[in-house]
């Protein structure tokens, strides 16, 4: 007899969007819920200037594991790395059209890239996709990358880019102390410090300046 089981294809193939139930955590028993009630970290309010985002509850962690977070997975692609170089080159060409001197052209390029990156990766919270039940509503895109694993190759690349950009632009305004200090402050305080582990899940609230920037 001919064994046809090897030639037959499975009737159902797992879709990329099929929930990953293997990583889900077990639901706590009723006794655990009574002894240790679950608190929703997203509802907490703090009047202090500096606060720290609490770890997700088990419901949020399960929601995060259900489907891939498409808001952050694209950042790991090598093509996404190239986008940063292309954006910097385009900014440099754009500002050179106005006849600015090289030091001002590189200053505007440096500040535009770093501030734009900060708004996109460190200021806006949540995700435009509603696949995870709002489990990422309290996290920035930077905190969503690589499941919050620090110093991955992608994170290191994104950390090095503003530093290299500053070193390149520094060749043009090294004799101008004002521009040097301005670019140094922007690079360090906005381009580097928010990417370090000491600022992970850290929130600095300045009344009237920083607000609840979140994708809805």
From Swiss-Prot:
GO molecular function: identical protein binding
Annotated GO biological process: ceramide metabolic process; intracellular sphingolipid homeostasis; negative regulation of sphingolipid biosynthetic process; response to unfolded protein; sphingolipid biosynthetic process
InterPro entries: ORMDL (IPR007203)
Residues passing through the membrane, by range: 79-99, 104-124, 149-169, 178-198
Localization per Swiss-Prot or TrEMBL: Endoplasmic reticulum membrane
Region annotation (Disordered) ranges: 1-50
Keyword Protein biosynthesis assigned: no
Cytoplasmic-facing ranges: 1-78, 125-148, 199-216
Composition bias type Polar residues, residue spans: 17-38
Regions annotated as coiled coil: none
Family to which the UniProt record says this protein belongs: Belongs to the ORM family.
Note: Present with 5240 molecules/cell in log phase SD medium.
Function summary: Component of the SPOTS complex that acts as a negative regulator of sphingolipid synthesis. Acts by inhibiting serine palmitoyltransferases (LCB1 and LCB2) activity. Along with ORM1, plays a role in the phosphorylation of LAC1 and YPK1, the distribution of actin patches between mother and daughter cells, and in endocytosis.
Subunit record text: Component of the SPOTS complex, at least composed of LCB1/2 (LCB1 and/or LCB2), ORM1/2 (ORM1 and/or ORM2), SAC1 and TSC3.
Entry protein name: Protein ORM2
Gene name as annotated: ORM2
């Amino acid at each position: 007899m001919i064994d046809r089981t090897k030639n037959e294809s499975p009737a159902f193939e797992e879709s990329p969007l099929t929930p990953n139930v293997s990583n889900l955590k077990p639901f706590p028993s009723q006794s655990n819920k009574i002894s240790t009630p679950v608190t929703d970290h997203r509802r907490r309010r703090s009047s202090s200037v500096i606060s720290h985002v609490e770890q997700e509850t088990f419901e949020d962690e399960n929601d995060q594991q259900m489907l891939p977070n498409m808001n952050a997975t694209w950042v790991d692609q090598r093509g996404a790395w190239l986008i940063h170089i292309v954006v910097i080159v385009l900014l440099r060409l754009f500002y050179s059209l106005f006849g600015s001197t090289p030091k001002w052209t590189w200053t505007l390029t440096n500040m535009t890239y770093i501030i734009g990156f900060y708004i996109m990766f460190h200021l806006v919270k949540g995700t435009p996709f509603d696949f995870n039940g709002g489990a990422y509503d309290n996290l920035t895109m930077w905190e969503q990358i690589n499941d919050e694993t620090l110093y991955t190759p992608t994170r290191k690349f994104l950390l090095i880019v503003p530093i290299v950009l500053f070193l390149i632009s520094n060749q043009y305004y090294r004799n101008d102390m004002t521009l040097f200090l301005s670019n140094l402050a922007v690079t360090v305080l906005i381009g580097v410090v928010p990417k370090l582990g000491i600022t992970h899940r850290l929130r600095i609230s300045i009344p009237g300046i920083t607000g609840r920037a979140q994708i809805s």
